[in-house]
């Protein structure tokens, strides 16, 4: 496979995100995700490995916009309660620790969103599933294409929240770390 073919795979995965603007079913999923974020008392995000890094990026951006957002497992993460939202990120949808968190959260409320590549067991606990159906590549190992697409998708979500709430970059700058 040539470098150009690899780039085409990445480009096509990004183009998959167009469906959130061109297909009513996908527009509704995006709107539901954004509505739930805006209405949640607190937002909890969890993923493992590189999906976890993507989750941390998303939690940080939500905090920059003024939301109470937390990455599950950090020492400063508060308890999950009935008015909260849990967003799970898992390429396989079968990661054991993600399933454990989903099971515990389901006993507290039904406000769980799963962002996945493959619809594994985690979707049984989610009341909204967003499958990012990306193409895999021989030279972009394991979940690379999912992780890249998830990062771009979640940045798209941030942009949509900013539009909906009429926020601009100055809101982010106000909450950006200023001690380093």
Curated annotation (Swiss-Prot):
It catalyses: D-arabino-hex-3-ulose 6-phosphate = beta-D-fructose 6-phosphate. GO terms for molecular function: 6-phospho-3-hexuloisomerase activity; carbohydrate derivative binding. SUPFAM superfamilies: SIS domain. The active site is at 147 (proton acceptor). Disulfide bonds: none annotated. The keyword rRNA-binding does not apply. Its EC number is 5.3.1.27. Catalyzes the isomerization between 3-hexulose 6-phosphate and fructose 6-phosphate. PANTHER family: 3-HEXULOSE-6-PHOSPHATE ISOMERASE. This is 3-hexulose-6-phosphate isomerase. The gene is phi.
């Amino acid at each position: 496979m040539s470098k150009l073919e690899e780039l085409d795979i990445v480009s096509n995965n990004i183009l998959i995100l167009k469906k959130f603007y061109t297909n009513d079913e996908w527009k509704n999923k995006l709107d539901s995700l954004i509505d739930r974020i805006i209405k949640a008392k607190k937002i909890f995000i969890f993923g493992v490995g590189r999906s976890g890094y993507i989750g941390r990026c998303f939690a940080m951006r939500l905090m920059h916009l003024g939301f109470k957002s937390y990455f599950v497992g950090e020492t400063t993460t508060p308890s999950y309660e009935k008015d909260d939202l849990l967003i799970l990120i898992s390429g396989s949808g079968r990661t054991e620790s993600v399933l454990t968190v989903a099971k515990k959260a389901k006993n507290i409320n039904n406000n769980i969103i799963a962002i996945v590549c493959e619809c594994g067991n985690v979707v049984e606990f989610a009341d909204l599933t967003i499958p990012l159906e990306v193409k895999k590549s021989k030279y972009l190992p394991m979940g690379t294409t999912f992780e890249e697409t998830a990062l771009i998708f979640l940045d798209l979500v941030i942009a949509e929240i900013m539009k909906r709430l009429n926020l601009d970059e100055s809101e982010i700058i106000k909450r950006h770390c200023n001690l380093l």
